[in-house]
Amino acid sequence: MEIAVIGNSEFILGFRLAGIRKTYTAENDEKLLESVNSVLADGQVGILVLNSSDMERLPRRLRTTLENSVKPTVIALGGEEGGLSMRERIKRSVGVDLWK
């Protein structure tokens, strides 16, 4: 399983420096949609990381799909994230509450 990161060039830079190879620069809405669909079609991606502001720019239907996705598990970073907490996302993806 691999990690994929989608965002503007500043957002993905740190992930690139940390060794994440699957990074997608999405400076506009069209590129963002294209990148998200590409990652969803890639069976090797287990975790998708994107900026919460980019998550809000996605169409409601796609956002709901991402919020309910188990593979890849979608993590939105930055700002106040609506929807499920990190604990709930991990619990959903592995099937166990790791905090208990």
Swiss-Prot record:
Is the keyword Ribonucleoprotein assigned to this protein?
no
Membrane topology value: Peripheral membrane protein
Q: Which UniProt keywords apply?
A: ATP synthesis, Cell membrane, Hydrogen ion transport, Ion transport, Membrane, Transport
Main localization is membrane
Please list the GO biological process terms of this entry.
proton motive force-driven plasma membrane ATP synthesis
Q: Which NCBIfam families match?
A: PRK02228.1
Homology family: Belongs to the V-ATPase F subunit family.
Quaternary structure, per UniProt, is: Has multiple subunits with at least A(3), B(3), C, D, E, F, H, I and proteolipid K(x).
Supply the name of the protein.
A-type ATP synthase subunit F
Species of provenance: Methanoregula boonei (strain DSM 21154 / JCM 14090 / 6A8)
Query: What is the name of the gene encoding this protein?
Result: atpF
